[in-house]
């Protein structure tokens, strides 16, 4: 997938997942439910947002700062899975799958984010087709990226992998 397509998907999500857009699309009752349940959270650099193995309680949308998703590998060494930037949403994959988090999320800088409880996020996906479509695009993009990474790691020699960096 091209970088232009990735940017278009991220921009679509940003247009759909915000107070103004929700107010335009949701019923007044649903909008109030959203507004009353979301929380603004702050984390300092190196704070843990959620732990690997923890039960998801909701999703986080990063408004300011940067974070990382990592998994502890062999001998306790952390492997960074991806970086989280402003506008990104995390926690949804485990929530949608009904499983515990498969990675740790940690603030790389001081961050501010919106936390949306699981029940409200799931409800919004049910009642808001635009949000559902934006999430479907986001998940599909990430699945494609994962497939590309697996192919890259499995089919290329170390020399070929280093040449592409």
Positions of predicted regions on the chain:
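Cyclic nucleotide-binding regulatory domains
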Residues: 22, 47-109
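Short, flexible turn/loop "capping" segments at secondary-structure junctions
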Residues: 41-43, 105, 143
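A generic structural signal for short hydrophobic patches within well-formed alpha-helices
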Residues: 121-122
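All-alpha effector-binding/dimerization core of bacterial HTH-type transcriptional repressors
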Residues: 112-113
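Polybasic "coupling" helices that flank or enter modular domains
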Residues: 108, 126-165
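Cyclic nucleotide-binding regulatory module and flanking cytosolic helices
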Residues: 1-45, 89, 94-95
């Amino acid at each position: 997938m091209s970088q232009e397509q990735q940017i278009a998907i991220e921009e679509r999500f940003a247009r759909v997942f915000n107070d103004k857009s929700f107010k335009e699309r949701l019923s007044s009752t649903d909008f109030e439910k959203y507004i009353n349940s979301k929380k603004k959270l702050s984390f300092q650099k190196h704070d843990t947002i959620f732990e690997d193995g923890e039960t998801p309680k909701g999703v986080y949308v990063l408004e300011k700062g940067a974070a990382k998703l990592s998994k502890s590998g062999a001998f306790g060494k952390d492997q960074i899975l991806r970086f989280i930037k402003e506008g990104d949403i995390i926690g949804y994959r485990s929530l949608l799958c009904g499983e515990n988090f498969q990675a740790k999320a940690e603030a790389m800088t001081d961050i501010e984010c919106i936390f949306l409880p699981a029940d409200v996020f799931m409800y919004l996906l049910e009642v808001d087709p635009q949000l559902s479509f934006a999430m479907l695009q986001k998940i599909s993009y990430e699945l494609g990226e994962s497939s590309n990474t697996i192919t890259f790691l499995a089919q290329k020699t170390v020399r070929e992998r280093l040449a592409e960096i």
